[in-house]
Amino acid sequence: FPVQIFKVKEGVNFNPGDPNYDLFQLALKTSAQRLFPNFSFIDAPFNLQYYRPGDYNTEVAYMGCRTRVMGNVYDPTKEVTCGRGNLSFTSINLPRLGIEAHGDIDKFFKSLDDMIDLVIRQLMHRFKIQCSKVVRNYPFLMGQGIWIDSEKLNINDQVGEVLKNGTLSVGFIGLAETLVALTGKHH
């Protein structure tokens, strides 16, 4: 950290002839050697549905851990990047599940389903604890109006209504190693 996010957009830097195509090529070369920067493809179908030309708030954002912040289940009218963030994340250790499955794909997916359920319960528990905190527990984020609607709160108000605009993430690690554990080879 800090992590650099390189935004890619047709007409800006994606295609040969775009004004900043050379910068995109340099970013690709750098990423091939250093694994950074990360890339945000604004025109990808799952991002483009939120994008409104000229409104940077509607350009999808990624956190340092590559968590995508855009969709808002709580309030779809606030599907923007500014004033929001990822509240908590948990990564599932896929190789462990693969090793424990001893090559049994059905057992692996059953274990994965169970683990996802556990992680969701864990994230919701953590969210409940975070929501019980008050503005003074987050003096910068809430006290300075950084989060959406936090300027409406007083110093001793709970922050739950504001945090509902955030995200909770389930991630995974070790996909290639999991394939080796289950099938003997990876991609």
Per-region residue spans from a language model:
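Conserved catalytic cores of very large enzyme subunits
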Residues: 1-165, 185-187
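Contiguous, well-ordered alpha-helical segments that form the cores/surfaces of helical PPI scaffolds
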Residues: 168-181
